[in-house]
Amino acid sequence: MLFKKVDLENNIHDVRVHGDRILDIAPELVAEEGETVIHANGGALLPGLHDHHIHMNATAAALNSLSCGPPDVASEQELADALNKAAAQFPLQWVRGVGYYPFKGNEEHNIIDCDWLDKNGPDCPVRIQHRSGRLWIFNTKGLDALNMKGALLSDDIHRTGHIYDTDASVQEALASDPQNLSDLIDILLSYGITGVTEVTPRNSPEDFLNYLKHTAPLKMTIMGRPTLIDMIDKSTARVNIGHVKLHYHDHDLPSLETLTKEIEEAHSQGRGVASHCVTHAELLLTLAAIEAAGPSIKDRIEHAAIVTQEALDWIKQLNIGVVTQPSFIVARDEAYQQDIEQNM
């Protein structure tokens, strides 16, 4: 493959590539017979980009899901209209929505429920995911479908339609087969993204083998459960194991001693931890546990959505990384202004 007229450090050159090797760089190269030629017209030639925080299966599923939150949907009426329109296009099928966020503020009483979906949504099974990824909201037909799969649903779930990620009794019924990742991989490659870090907490050895089989030519680092260490001998130059993912929330935070032990065990495997931290409490507990365990240069914080100056200084002292999503400031500005305390 021959790249013509590319920008390399402010100089225009031609670059010849074969496989994963750069063979030649010169001001002018002549195309060989049968060689693919790409005319860059002065555009920069960059190494492949790496997405350091992605949920591959969830992102692939979202490509075929209905957007149920800002900026596409900005009110409950717009949500109802979108759900009914989607159901009309695919009658009798599940309507799967993602990205929902309460339009009046992210308090529990503002979140729609089963009754709202029954009254305002379509006459088919509906399942909507809160933007946090922690909550699914079902209508009655959706709950009936779960019952038919043998899920054990509490009275509270039947009343609200709310199923949180901690409701282990319904995880098997909610679980879907691995997604076809080919469309997502094509999209990533079209952006110049040639490698990703898969950050789903429940990633297991089985997930590792599935990614190994179905994600070429994408390079992948897969974080997840401690048991991923069993795949160390199956790691390749393209797919390898990464951090132990820690994923707790304010309502179910472990003790400092428990979290410290988890971090110590990850370090004993030669792995860092990647800790999901979107609240002040989650971040402070994580930093305290990393300090108690002894920080590793491999340790990192995911999101770091709320960081006080004190916490920032602590992160610097521990010399650990932060993988955040700066685009959230633009995409979620209104919600942040509404929901986050000003003194934070």
Name each region found by the language model.
Residues 2, 7-18, 22-216, 222-224, ...:
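Divalent metal-binding segments
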Residues 46-52, 302-303, 323-325:
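Active-site neighborhood of phospho(di)ester-bond hydrolases with catalytic His/Asp-centered motifs
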Residues 55, 237-249, 320-330:
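Non-cysteine beta-strand/loop elements that form the S-adenosyl-L-methionine
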Residues 63-69, 298, 303, 332-343:
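Short beta-alpha connecting loops at secondary-structure transitions
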Residues 210-242, 307-309, 313:
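Extended hydrophobic/aromatic segments used for targeting, binding, or gating
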